[in-house]
A protein has these predicted regions:
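Flexible, solvent-exposed coil segments and beta strand-coil junctions
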Residues: 66-67, 85-97, 133-140, 150
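Periplasmic N-terminal accessory/gating domains of Gram-negative outer-membrane beta-barrel systems
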Residues: 1-76, 86-93
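Transmembrane beta-barrel architecture of outer-membrane proteins
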Residues: 6, 19, 55, 65, ...
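Outer-membrane beta-barrel architecture
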Residues: 3, 23, 86-88, 102, ...
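Short sequence motifs at beta-strands and strand-loop junctions characteristic
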Residues: 14-16, 62, 79, 104-106, ...
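Transmembrane beta-barrel wall of Gram-negative outer-membrane proteins
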Residues: 106-136, 145-173
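Outer-envelope beta-barrel architecture signal
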Residues: 30-32, 64, 97-101, 122-128, ...
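Extracellular loop and loop/strand-boundary signature of outer-membrane beta-barrel proteins
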Residues: 53, 98-100, 140-147
Length: 173
């Protein structure tokens, strides 16, 4: 997601291009504040270095993303005190009709996502979406003889219960 955002006017990637830093109008990479469903998160990437906000691998599962909003000025009061910008990620709810899922196999990791209604007895008011992701960079690095062994597991989940037409309860983790 950050690679797409980096292509917008006034934004640039980090020098070297291997990190997911977002530099807004010349500000430092750690001056951008990230929110996931209106909860501030300090870092959205694995393997970040001091003074940066981006490592080479994102932590947020793209299967969960419903909407991304970037604000580069005139921040609302709900965003505390960002210096360069605010990047807000909104997660989607699980499928209300049936259980489904996907499996992704990438260059550095593989992931599985499962979603659906909890039960038909509550008229599909409660949905879930869960995923797990595992890197296999450590095996690739070992094969080519590199001394480092980067390794990570990601688990992400969201449960949504629709209380009425205007209210819902979300549990994320």
């Amino acid at each position: 997601v950050t690679k797409v955002v980096q292509s917008m006017p006034g934004l640039s990637p980090s020098v070297g291009g291997f990190r997911n830093d977002i530099i807004i109008r010349g500000g430092a990479p750690n001056e951008t504040v990230y929110y996931l469903d209106e909860i501030e998160i300090p870092n959205i990437n694995h393997f970040s270095t001091q003074g940066s906000a981006g490592g080479p691998q994102g932590m947020i599962n793209i299967s969960f993303i419903d909407e991304v909003t970037l604000s580069t000025s005139a921040f609302g009061v709900e965003y505390d005190n960002p210096l360069s910008g605010v990047l807000q990620f909104n997660q989607r709810n699980g499928n209300t009709k049936y259980i489904s899922g996907n499996f992704r196999f990438g260059a550095s990791d593989s992931a599985i996502t499962i979603e659906g209604p909890f039960s038909k007895s509550d008229n599909n008011k409660t949905t879930f979406i869960f995923s797990a992701r595992k890197s296999y960079l450590q095996f690739l690095f070992k094969l080519i003889g590199l001394p480092i062994r980067p390794d990570y597991w990601d688990f992400q989940g969201k449960i949504n219960h629709k209380i009425d037409e205007y209210n819902s309860l979300n549990i994320i983790g």
